[in-house]
């Protein structure tokens, strides 16, 4: 009995010692985490993304719900977006269309299916190529300029001066640019689609001897009004996303001239990624109905 009691006492003492050690370890971990949280800052990308989402919500609130928009600034931005983007978008669409024409004509001529080339070109242009190409051009030409402009205003405290004068930066700087890009990109896409199809028709006729009427008839047979609609909707969404990201990254710029350059580059990269992500979800929703 005495041996058993001694064993139980030793077990109890061992358990108490283990509990004390675990408690001390827990206190040390808690203290470490507490100190780490005091000095932890969220990643710059995270809070920039949250700020950009907030900007998008504010723009929707101002424009859609409150019907509040600075028309003078918006028209100025539309006049800026068109010339900056149209020429490059048309040229890019032309060559992309001709590249696809070469592939389609070469492969489908082997199996006697030249009658479907026009339809395939039309579907490829309306559903994917035209809105994505124009969005990429917009991100590189206009989005970068917006980020650089607003970034410069931010680091030079011009945005703070606007607030001091009683002007809301969202109403004066952000909303006009978002609306301008969202309105302009569908128009640019329609023009680029026409130019791309024209270049494809010309190449098919001159290089492969396929009649322009055959291409046009095939495109008219396969294309529906919904295809033009999805092209316009994608372009509108891409324009709004690009402008919002560019404004968000511009208005969160820090670090002087170096920060402006970094924000400009980052805004273009994030915009390009966002284009393809948004494109995927729109296509998944639209074409799975």
List PLM regions with ranges.
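Short, membrane-interfacial amphipathic segments enriched in basic
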Residues: 25-74, 249-254
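Membrane-interfacial helix-loop-helix connectors in multipass membrane proteins
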Residues: 103-126, 194-236, 240, 244-266, ...
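Hydrophobic alpha-helical transmembrane segments of multi-pass membrane transport proteins
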Residues: 117-160, 245
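N-terminal mitochondrial targeting presequence
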Residues: 1-3
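Selective transmembrane-helix segments that form parts of the transport pathway or gating/packing helices
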Residues: 82, 86, 90, 129, ...
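Final/C-terminal transmembrane alpha-helix of multipass membrane proteins
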Residues: 260, 266-283
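Short cytoplasmic-facing helical segments at TM-TM junctions of multi-pass membrane proteins
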Residues: 150-175, 257-260
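Active-site cofactor/substrate anionic-group-binding motifs, chiefly glycine-
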Residues: 69, 73, 77-133, 137
């Amino acid at each position: 009995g005495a041996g058993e009691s001694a064993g139980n006492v030793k077990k109890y003492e061992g358990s108490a010692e283990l509990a004390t050690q675990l408690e001390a370890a827990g206190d040390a971990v808690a203290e470490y985490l507490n100190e780490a949280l005091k000095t932890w800052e969220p990643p710059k990308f995270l809070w920039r993304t949250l700020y950009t989402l907030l900007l998008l919500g504010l723009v929707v609130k101002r424009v859609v719900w409150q019907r509040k928009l600075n028309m003078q600034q918006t028209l100025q931005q539309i006049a800026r977006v068109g010339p900056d983007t149209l020429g490059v978008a048309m040229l890019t669409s032309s060559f992309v269309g001709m590249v696809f024409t070469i592939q389609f004509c070469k492969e489908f001529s082997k199996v006697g299916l030249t009658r479907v080339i026009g339809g395939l070109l039309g579907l490829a242009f309306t559903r994917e190529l035209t809105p994505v190409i124009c969005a990429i051009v917009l991100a590189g030409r206009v989005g970068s300029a917006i980020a650089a402009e607003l970034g410069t205003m931010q680091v030079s405290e011009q945005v703070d001066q606007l607030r001091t004068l009683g002007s809301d930066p969202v109403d004066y700087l952000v909303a006009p640019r978002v609306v301008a890009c969202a309105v302009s990109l569908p128009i640019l896409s329609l023009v680029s689609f026409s130019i791309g199809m024209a270049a494809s028709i010309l190449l098919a006729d001159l290089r492969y001897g396929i009649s322009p009427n055959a291409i046009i008839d095939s495109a008219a047979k396969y294309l529906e009004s919904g295809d033009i609609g999805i092209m316009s909707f994608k372009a509108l969404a891409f324009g709004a996303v690009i402008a919002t990201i560019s404004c968000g990254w511009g208005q969160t710029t820090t670090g002087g001239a170096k920060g402006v350059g970094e924000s400009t580059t980052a805004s273009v990269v994030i915009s390009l990624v966002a284009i393809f992500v948004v494109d995927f979800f729109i296509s998944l929703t639209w074409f799975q109905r």
